[in-house]
UniProtKB/Swiss-Prot annotation:
GO molecular function: hydrolase activity
The keyword Zinc belongs to this UniProt entry's keyword annotation: no
SMART domains: Lactamase_B
Family in the record: Belongs to the UPF0173 family.
HAMAP family membership: UPF0173
Protein name (database record): UPF0173 metal-dependent hydrolase Cmaq_1073
Entries under InterPro entries matching the protein: Metallo-B-lactamas, RibonucZ/Hydroxyglut_hydro, UPF0173, UPF0173_UPF0282_UlaG_hydrolase
Alphabetized UniProt keyword annotations: Hydrolase
PANTHER family for the chain: UPF0173 METAL-DEPENDENT HYDROLASE MJ1163, UPF0173 METAL-DEPENDENT HYDROLASE MJ1163-RELATED
Amino acid sequence: MGYLKWLGHAAFEVELMGKRILIDPWISNPNSPVTLGELSKVDFILVTHDHSDHLGEAVQIANKTNATVVSIFELAVYLAEKEGVKNTIGMNIGGPVKLTNEIEVYMTPALHSSTHGSPVGFVIKSPEAVIYHAGDTGLFSDMELIGRLYKPDVALLPIGGYFTMSPREAAYAVSLINPRAVVPMHYNTFPQIRQDPEEFRNLTESLAPHVRVYVMKPGDVLNLPIK
C-alpha cells in the first residue's frame, strides 16, 4: 500500500510501489512536520520550478540520499553543473519518463514564473495511484484535458491566491480535472497566502460534489489507493 504525506506548503512525500518520492521539498518551511535529518531514504525528487519555496532543500537531500532529481531540462542542467547533483533527469512538458518499470511521470504546463526553464506540474502514474501535483499555477482551461488524459486519483492544488489560484479558482479547477479526491496546498505559509481551506471545501462541494476533499494538516497521511 502506498501513501501521500503532506509536509507543508507544496511539499509532499509519496510512496508508490515501494519507492519514496519527494515533491517540491522545502523541508525548512515553517509548517514542516519533519527535519532534513529524518529524511534518510529518498529515491526520487520532483521539482516543479526553481523558486526557493519549491526547490527547497532538494540539493542537500539528493546529495545525502543519492536520490534522482526530476525537473524541467534547464533546471536539471543547473543542478548538475552548478550545484553538483549527481543524478538528474531533465525532461520537458509531455512524457512519459519511466522512473521504474512501474512508475512513470508526465510533465504538465503551469501558469507561473521560473528562472531556469518553464514552471510545470507533474502527473505520477503507477498501478497503486495516479497523482497530479499542479505546481504553482493559475487556472487554465487545459486542466480539463489533464483530467481526461491522465484520470488522476488525487489532485494536489494550490489555493493560497496572490501567487497561485485562490480557493474559488482552485475549486473550479477541480470541476475541470475531475479527480477522485483533491488535497489543497500552498496556503497559510506566510501572510500573503492566508486562506481558509474550508472555503475551498465548500466551493468544491458545490461545483464538484462527487470529488472528495481532504483538508490535511502537515504530517497527515493519505493512504493509497483511494478507497
